[in-house]
Amino acid sequence: IAGSIRSLLQLSYSEYEIVVINDGSKDATIDVLRKEFDLFPFPEACNTQLPTAEIRAIYHSSLHTNLRVIDKENGGKADSLNAGINLSVYPLFCCIDADSILQPDSLRRAVQPFLDDHRTVASGGTVRIANGCRVDNGMLTKIGLPSNLLALFQIVEYLRAFLFGRLGWSPMNAMLIISGAFGIFRKEAVVTVGGYRSDTIGEDMELVVRLHRHLRLGEKPYRITFVP
């Protein structure tokens, strides 16, 4: 996870925050983060607009002023994402997985639809498999292919899903899913529909479908788009 955070700290974006959520892990996650980023507990008011499991502590980094860490009781991925939304301060938020590594221009490119069209409520980017690639200090330095046949099939499937399926659905405003590994949402819209739900397996797809339903029933103009 430290490598993923380092990749986020190197994003070429003018103003952003990083909120890491430790979902009641029983390993040394918090200890590793404390050591790597010199974290210290910081009492901070946190919105409760979305219900979540109990927040144990909120940490700030003395090395990076835009990095905060939430330590909470276990509640699952959806619950953790809601906790991050509650603490976030900007009108847009980006959700990624703990093992996601973003290219320096990823955030800037994925935010562009919001700048081009004020109706945009969500934007998804392309996710690719890093098996066979080289990652140094949170940065992708060499692109390669894995030797495992199943991993190769997975790469082909990801290319099909993102560069064929989503490219076709996006112009029709019919995107049914934005990958939980990399997606940007308008916070107001997500909070209005109740955030992520913990009682479903595919919380990323369920949220997108719920946004479609809410905005269509309300006859509100909106866009949910994909950036290749």
Label the predicted regions:
Residues 201-207:
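Acidic donor-binding loop at a coil-to-helix junction in glycosyltransferase catalytic cores
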Residues 8, 23-24, 75:
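Conserved short acidic donor-positioning loop in nucleotide-sugar-dependent glycosyltransferases
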